């Protein structure tokens, strides 16, 4: 059997491929904040799309990829409602999973949980952008308020692969808002073989704290907002500090920091690179439904 893999496409866009099926988390490809890593052709194999929350760099490209590939989109009630009524995706291609629910689709068992996002005040962001004359930040705030379900709940996923491996997408949950009790409850509820999670800002201690409780066998960290934070005048600690913190939290785990274009074999932890597909190199899949 072909080994299961995780690929990282930049931002919070990741894929998990197992047993011939591919699920994408928060696929996002458009040029944004100076980054232009991949294109829609690179998401052509999508069978499923899982939305973690409604901020624009997690959401804006989901409708177009879903239309092109006929992937089934999984998200909270707020996210699927927005996709149905504001973006015109048919109801039969939307699968609503709210917090602490579960289902199965061909290739994956899927369970959900809630996590807490660092504080974001959209009104304050607009005001600050106006005062500073930061048109990029202003465009982000306006787009977030009008083109995506900004206040959709923050939702993580745990996938169970056909061989029993569990993959948790913790997204941006490594932060000071998550309490020790909440993390412990996740660890009691789920066995975590692989955790996918963001590394950003000064949340180094929170990476160690979370990994120490979850005790995964593999930790795959990615930088969800480096380019965005640079646009906002913020920066994050070096990647090496996050990986060291994760390793300290789970000394026996395989820890990998993902740059865009990184692929990890979930069987043995080997790391390789994949390249952006040239425009037109690969046609998008024919319109055949993959809904369960």
Predicted feature locations:
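Active-site HxH/HxHxD metal-binding segment of metal-dependent hydrolases
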Residues: 38-123
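Binuclear metal-ion centers of metallo-dependent hydrolases, dominated by the metallo-beta-lactamase
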Residues: 72, 84-102, 210-292
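Pre-active-site segment of Zn-dependent metallo-hydrolases
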Residues: 15-67, 119-147, 173-190, 290
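Active-site neighborhood of phospho(di)ester-bond hydrolases with catalytic His/Asp-centered motifs
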Residues: 24-28, 46-54, 74-77, 167-173, ...
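Short, surface-exposed amphipathic charged segments that create phosphate/polyanion-binding patches used
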Residues: 106-115, 127-128, 268-279
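Active-site-proximal loop/helix segments of hydrolase catalytic cores
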Residues: 35, 142-214
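Beta-strand-turn-beta hairpins that frame and shape the catalytic cleft
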Residues: 1-5, 17-23, 102-111, 160-167, ...
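Active-site environment of divalent metal-dependent phosphoester hydrolases
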Residues: 31-32, 55-60, 80-83, 101-103, ...
């Amino acid at each position: 059997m072909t080994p299961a893999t995780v690929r990282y496409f930049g931002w919070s866009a990741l894929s998990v491929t197992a047993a011939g099926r591919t699920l994408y988390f928060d696929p996002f490809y458009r040029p944004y904040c100076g980054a232009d890593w991949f294109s829609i052709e690179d998401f052509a194999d999508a069978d499923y799309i899982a939305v973690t929350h409604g901020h624009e760099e997690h959401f804006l490209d989901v409708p177009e990829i879903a239309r092109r590939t006929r992937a089934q989109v999984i998200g909270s009630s707020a996210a699927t409602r927005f996709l149905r009524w504001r973006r015109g995706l048919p109801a039969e291609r939307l699968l609503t999973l709210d917090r602490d629910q579960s289902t199965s689709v061909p290739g994956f068992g899927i369970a959900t949980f809630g996590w807490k996002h660092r504080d974001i005040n959209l009104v304050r962001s607009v005001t600050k952008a106006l005062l500073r004359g930061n048109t990029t930040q202003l465009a982000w705030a306006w787009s977030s308020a009008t083109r995506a379900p900004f206040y959709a709940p923050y939702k993580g996923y745990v996938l169970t692969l056909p061989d029993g491996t569990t993959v948790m997408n913790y997204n941006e949950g490594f932060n000071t808002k998550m309490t020790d009790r909440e993390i412990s409850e996740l660890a009691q509820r789920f066995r975590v073989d692989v955790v996918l999670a963001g590394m950003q800002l000064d949340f180094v201690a929170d990476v160690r704290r979370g990994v120490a409780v979850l005790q995964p066998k593999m930790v795959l960290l990615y930088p969800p907002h480096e380019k965005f934070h640079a646009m906002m005048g913020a920066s994050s600690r070096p990647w090496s500090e996050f990986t060291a913190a994760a390793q300290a939290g789970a000394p026996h785990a395989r820890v990998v920091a993902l740059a865009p274009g990184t692929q990890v074999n979930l069987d043995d932890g080997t790391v390789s690179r994949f390249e952006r597909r040239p425009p037109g190199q690969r046609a998008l899949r024919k319109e055949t439904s993959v809904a369960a």
